[in-house]
Amino acid sequence: MQLLEGHIQHYAWGSHDVIARMTERAAPTTEPEAELWLGAHEAAPSRLLGDGAQGHLDALVAADPQRVLGDLAARFGGRLPFLLKVLAPVQALSIQAHPSAAEAASAPAGTYGDGWAKPEAWYALTDFEVFAGLRPFDDTRALAELLDVEALTGHVAAATAASEPARALLATLLHLSADEQADLADAVVEACRPLAPAEPALDAVVRIAEQHPRDIGLVVLLTMRHVVLRPGDYAFVDAGVLHAGVRGVVVEILANSDNVVRAGLTPKHIDVDELLRIADLDRQIEPERGVLDEGWTCFPASTPYFRLRTATLAPDTLPVPGEDQPRILFALDAPVEVVGSGATVRVAPGQGCFLEAGEQAYVRAVAPDGAVSDAPRPRVFLAAPGEA
């Protein structure tokens, strides 16, 4: 077992207090803190903590993948297949889609950093506002008519005759000149303003326009479903699904990859052709609740890369499942102890504990002085490989 310190990503859209408070540091922070990564991705691997510990989790895995990963070493090329994050946006993220493994492997050289798919899933810690998946095209057409922006209704009408109207409309919007995109975004936002108080999706577009003025992504958002995940909701986001987080706090579990293509709300390059190639415009996200199994709330994912479980700890000990697999346990709200064969690791809120394949362990709540306690009751999240 190894105590882990997550890596904080200071993206501009992040909160100045959420992750700091979660990890028991002073807030507000000078820099924004957007994401906390727990895993072995080479871009931001977790640091190993504890007596005699040195280095980072990626190096630990690479030194002996067969021991650390067990039977998964060959299947995933010696890489830990999952990555666990906390996302804390106070501004909208870019509109994104991620490739399947086949799409990543067949893309032109340099498009992606690796040949992996990048499905992901969110567990909401607070209300989490997001745009994800597309509206039915008839709904997009009705919304365009309601907004009555001539350029937009013209683009929608032209796309209607296509075999895939939604894809045709997306292609049209993203292939407009920069000036045409900016003018259309301005006109659409102004048309949204009087309707925004009664329409949450339009209200979100108006708010996001303050963060990303004149961005074509504001128009793309109108073609997407507006969803608010409630605390405890879980949503699986498969490869190809367009999505953009807006605000809130989630635990995110994903394949151990950073492959991404963007569709707006970003100053970064938009690879329109690749986006149109990989975007799955029919698939949606469906918020769900997990199933209780031996003290853990378990969430399914139709992917071999990851599976998420969570539990709120009582005074009793709770066995950590999946002993034949590598796992990361993440603590929130109060410290916990992970007890293994001959070793005990104390995990503070915001820290993680890595368990190698073959390691048996259980977890229990502890008071700051080490005594077993039932208040406050910590929450733990367990990231493990999937079973698909």
What are these regions (language model features)?
Residues A62, Q66-G70, R214-R230, P321-G322, ...:
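A short beta-strand-loop-beta hairpin characteristic of the jelly-roll/cupin
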Residues V249-C298:
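C-terminal, non-catalytic macromolecule-binding modules
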Residues M224-V237, V241-G245, G340-A361:
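Short acidic-glycine-tyrosine-enriched beta hairpin
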Residues P304-E323, G358:
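Conserved short histidine dyad/triad with adjacent acidic residue
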Residues M1-P197, P267, V272-I285, L308:
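Transition-metal
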Residues D179-L221:
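Active-site cores enriched in adjacent His and Asp/Glu residues with nearby glycine-rich loops
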Residues L93-Q96, P119-V130, G248-P267, F306, ...:
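A short hydrophobic beta-strand segment most commonly corresponding to one strand
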Residues R193-E210, T297-P300, P315-Q325:
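Short beta-strand/loop turn elements enriched in aromatics
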